[in-house]
C-alpha cells in the first residue's frame, strides 16, 4: 500500500512518531538481517557490548551514532553488511548488585549457595538487563537484533571453554601463588587494568626496629624505616639496604626485632633499594607489596600473609587480629608511639591503587590464581603491527597500543565470583580427601565427563573431582567477542567465513588496554588473524565548560531526555557535527533545568528545514511520471540548474570519500551546509521564480531537479539522520512500504555536471546579494521598500553573467531595479549620498532616497559607534595590563587582539558612513 503525500503536506514534523514508525518497520521487514550468501563484499562491525547492568549515557549515544553512520553508509555502497549487537555479563557489577539485594534480606551469597545465586542472577538479567538494549534501539541502531549475543550465551560459553583448553594445552595458562591486586570490597582479584591510581594526601611514618646482638639480646640501638603502610610491619620478614650505602654496610646480616609479633628478621642487602627514599633502610613484606615480593624471591624470604580477604587482619597479626586494615593502622601507630618507636610523621602525597569497581584501596595479597602468559602472544601482535594490522585512526593511538604490548605482564584471569564463565578445571582428590590447596593436582577439560576421563587416565580410578569455583575475568570472554559471536570455534560457520575478520572496531581510547589489545591477542592466537582491519578511536563527550561528562561529576546527560525533546535524529546529527577529527573530544551544551541543548536544537531545526523543503517540493509537483532528466531537459538547463547539479555532485564525491576515511564530522558539516544553504536558501528560491514563470517547460525541469537533488541529499543524509530521511524519501518517491531507503544504493556520481567556473560565478553572485542585503539593513530599509542598486565593474565576464540573472538579483535583494554598467559609463559623483561596498572587481552602490530616515539612521550609527568605541576602550585596558599578557592563556590574549582589530575596523567604517550623512 502506498502512503499518501497529503499526510506530509498537512502534518508538522513529530520526531517521536516518525522514529517509532520506522524502527518498527525496519524490524518487521528484517531490514538489517543479512544472509552470508547474499551478494556484496562483506562489511562487519561487532559492537562493543555494553554492560548488562548499564543504562544509556552520552558516551553510548556518541559511539552508537559513529558506528551506525559507517554501517548505513557501507550498506548504501552495496556491501553485505552485518552489524552484530550484544551485551556483556559484567561479573563484578552484577555480583555487587545481587549482594546488595541479599543484604536487604539479611543474607549473603554464601547463605543461599551458588546454584540459587546464579538463578537469581539470570532472573535479574532477564528482568533488568535488557534495559540498555531497548534504549539503544531508540537511537535507530541498524543492527541485526536476531543475532544479538550475550557473553554468557551457551554458544559463547562453549567458545570460552574451548579457548581456555587450547591455551592450557599450549602451556600458556598456569596456576600459581602470586601477589595479586585484591579488592576487599568485592573480595576478588582484579587485573592491573582494573586498578585506578589516585593521588592521596597521606603520611610517611618513621619508626624504628631494635637491633639484636649476636647473642640474641635486644640492644639499645635501632634501625629506622619510613613507610606509608605501617600496618604491614606485622608481616615483615627482613629489612633491606642498598649494598653501596655506606651508612648501613655494618648492619648487613645483623638482626632486628619486629614490634608486636616478637619476630627476629635479618638485615639484607639488595641493589634495588633506593638509598634516597626515607631513611634508605626499607622494611620488606613479601606477602603485601610487589617490590618486596621480588626482593623476597631474590633472597629466599618467608612470605607471611597478615590479611583476610575482607581487608581485616588474620591470626598472623597477633593482638590486632580481626581489626580492619585501616583501624589496625591507627592502633599500631598509637602503640608504636607509646613504645617510643615512632620517630616522625611527615605529610606525604602518595599514589594509591584503587579498585575501579570496588572504589577502595587495593590490597596486594598472596593468592593462588590462574594466569595467562602474555609474552609470546603479545609478540605475535607486535609483528602484525609492523604491517599496520590493525590500522589505528587516528594513528597516534598506535603508540599507546604498542607500548602496552611491549610492557605486558602475565594476566591474572581468575576472579573469586560466581556470576561469569566458571573455570573449566577440576581438582583431583582421593575419595578420603576434602580440601584443596595450591599443590592439589587438577585437569582442564571441556566438560566433566572429559575431566573424569583425563583424571582416571592420569591418577587412577579411586578419586573424586571438584570443579574450580572461580570464574574468568570478564575481559577474557570479551576478548573473544569479534569471532565467538560469529560461530567460532566452528570455523566453517557461514557467518564466521563471511564476516571474519571484522572490518572496523569503533571504541573509546579508555579501553585500548582492557579490550582492544586483548581482542587482537586472542584473535591472533585462535584464528591467526587480527580480528579487525581498522580501529577507530573516538574521543570523550564534554560539557560546555570542557569538562568530561560523567555521572560521578554530576554533569552527565541522559540521552533519552534529549531524544524525547528533539528526536534521536537531531541528537545523532548534533553529536556527529561536533566531531572536529578522529579521536577528538566533542562538546555538548545542556541546560539541566530546562532540559534544552542549543546544539541539539540546531539539528532539530535542520530536520525541520528538510521536512519543510520536502513539503515545498511536493506541493509544487505537477506531474507523476518519470522525474529523471531527459536529453531535452539537459539542453534547456538554466545557470542555476547547472550550478546546483555541479554542487550536488561535488558533495557526493567529497562526502563519500570522507566517509570512507572515517571523517564523519566533516561529512556532516558538508551535508548541513549544502542542504541548508545551497539547496534550501538558494536553489529553492531560484525555483520559486521559475514557478511564477508561465513557461511550463522551465518549471518542469526545475521540479525534476528539486526532486533529484532532494532525493540524493536524503540518501546521503540517511546514515546521519535515518528516520526522517526514510520518511521523506518515501513521500518523494511514492514507494511501497516494503521498499526501504536503508537498502538503496548511494547516489550515482555524474561528473558531467561538475563545473568549477559556474561554482565560482555563483559564489560571487551570492556574495553580491549578501552585500546588498547587508547595506539595506544598515540603511534601515523594510522589505517592502524597494530601492535601486548599481553594480559597476569592468570585468566583462562577470557583468555578462550577472545580466543573465538580473531578475533573480532584483527579487533576492528587494530592489526596484538593478543597473549593471562599466565604470566609464557612470559618474560616481552621483553616489555621494550612497552606502557602498566592494567585492572583487565589483563596486556596489545603494543611493539614499525618500525611504531612508536619515536622522534615525544617524542615531542608530551613533549608538553603534559608541558601543564599538566602549568595547575598544575595554580591550585596550586589558592588553595594556602586563599581568594579563603574562598570565592569561595565549589563545585568550590572541582573541583580545583579534577583537581589537575588528573593533577598530568597525569604528572606521561607521565613521565613514556618518560622514556621508552630514
From Swiss-Prot:
The record's GO CC annotations read:
cytosol
Might you give the EC number(s) for this enzyme?
A: 6.1.1.9
What does the record give under GO molecular function?
aminoacyl-tRNA deacylase activity; ATP binding; valine-tRNA ligase activity
- Please classify the protein's predominant subcellular localization into one broad category: cytoplasm
Q: Which reaction does it catalyse?
A: tRNA(Val) + L-valine + ATP = L-valyl-tRNA(Val) + AMP + diphosphate
Please state where this protein is localized. Cytoplasm
Keywords noted in UniProt: Aminoacyl-tRNA synthetase, ATP-binding, Coiled coil, Cytoplasm, Ligase, Nucleotide-binding, Protein biosynthesis
The short motif 'KMSKS' region is annotated over 548-552
Top-level lineage group: Bacteria
- Placement of sequence motif 'HIGH' region: 50-60
Which residues does the record give as ATP binding sites?
Answer: 551
InterPro entries the record matches: aa-tRNA-synth_I_CS, aa-tRNA-synth_Ia, Anticodon_Ia_Val, M/V/L/I-tRNA-synth_anticd-bd, Rossmann-like_a/b/a_fold, tRNA-bd_arm, tRNAsynth_Ia_anticodon-bd, Val-tRNA_synth_C_sf
Q: Which GO terms describe its biological process?
A: valyl-tRNA aminoacylation
Please give the family membership noted in the entry: Belongs to the class-I aminoacyl-tRNA synthetase family. ValS type 1 subfamily.
Task: Give the record's subunit note.
Answer: Monomer.
Q: What is known of its domains?
A: ValRS has two distinct active sites: one for aminoacylation and one for editing. The misactivated threonine is translocated from the active site to the editing site.
- Function in brief: Catalyzes the attachment of valine to tRNA(Val). As ValRS can inadvertently accommodate and process structurally similar amino acids such as threonine, to avoid such errors, it has a 'posttransfer' editing activity that hydrolyzes mischarged Thr-tRNA(Val) in a tRNA-dependent manner.
Please identify the protein, giving its name as recorded: Valine--tRNA ligase
Q: Name the species this protein comes from.
A: Prochlorococcus marinus subsp. pastoris (strain CCMP1986 / NIES-2087 / MED4)
